[in-house]
Amino acid sequence: MAADHTDVLIVGAGPAGLFAGFYVGMRGLSFRFVDPLPEPGGQLTALYPEKYIYDVAGFPKVYAKDLVKGLVEQVAPFNPVYSLGERAETLEREGDLFKVTTSQGNAYTAKAVIIAAGVGAFEPRRIGAPGEREFEGRGVYYAVKSKAEFQGKRVLIVGGGDSAVDWALNLLDTARRITLIHRRPQFRAHEASVKELMKAHEEGRLEVLTPYELRRVEGDERVRWAVVFHNQTQEELALEVDAVLILAGYITKLGPLANWGLALEKNKIKVDTTMATSIPGVYACGDIVTYPGKLPLIVLGFGEAAIAANHAAAYANPALKVNPGHSSEKAAPGT
């Protein structure tokens, strides 16, 4: 076979994709990752590498970047091929092979395909406040790539979900001052996190303002002020800030995958209990999939990845059984 051929092609190198690759490798098959981001890890790397994750089995807490590091090390003995900075554009059937072409004009073939593309293409949701776009990169942020960026700064966080609440807590030991505003009286974040947030507020370690919204951002070469307002009384407050962290969610798009002929439901790929899509030989796992009872959790993505990988392996090589047996009974990976 040509050098661009592997037994299995995995679209997406986020946590679910990486773990799927591990299991494909455990079954003795070759595999390639195709991902538009410049490095593995998906959103964990691109959006919150220094955010703690608390719901991964066996880890009381783990930095997102450390979880990715472990996944990359886990799959490394199986010699994965990484095609990073390439978006999968088309999927075609050529005889008993699939051909995927990418945004870089490359074509890769495989006997089976696993789609682990996360939420698809994503970009931050802007709230449209005057000065917001003007100061992007000069004090307005939509993600925390490094906590060090906020060292000793007065930070305004805008949002009411898990990211906003988690970062308000996570930056307590870094920022000089934290103010969190949310346009509703109640937060959407996990109950335990909200309880911890309000405790920190009561102790004077950070400020919480509800129901407040961002009216405008002001400054010179960098952000200097943020004007917020109470959305019921319209009362304004001018806050001296060094950084405005807008965590209002992300706009996601399925992108080219929408044209692959897959059965979809609300921009998610429909799968059965084997993680099979509507196209035989194409499987999917992680945040990209939907099925009755689906929850968008990393820990579930790992389970889905194992199911998808083992069924894809058996499809690519019918001599293999779907059940891989126990990993503890096998030789160490790479030996």
From Swiss-Prot:
It catalyses: 2 reduced [2Fe-2S]-[ferredoxin] + NADP(+) + H(+) = 2 oxidized [2Fe-2S]-[ferredoxin] + NADPH. Belongs to the ferredoxin--NADP reductase type 2 family. Keywords: FAD, Flavoprotein, NADP, Oxidoreductase. PANTHER family: THIOREDOXIN REDUCTASE 1-RELATED-RELATED (PTHR48105). Homodimer. Transmembrane segments: none annotated. This is Ferredoxin--NADP reductase. SUPFAM superfamilies: FAD/NAD(P)-binding domain. Binds 1 FAD per subunit. It comes from the Bacteria. Gene3D superfamilies: FAD/NAD(P)-binding domain. The keyword NADP applies. The keyword S-adenosyl-L-methionine does not apply. It is an enzyme of class 1 (oxidoreductase). FAD binds at residues 35, 43, 48, 88, 122, 287, 328.
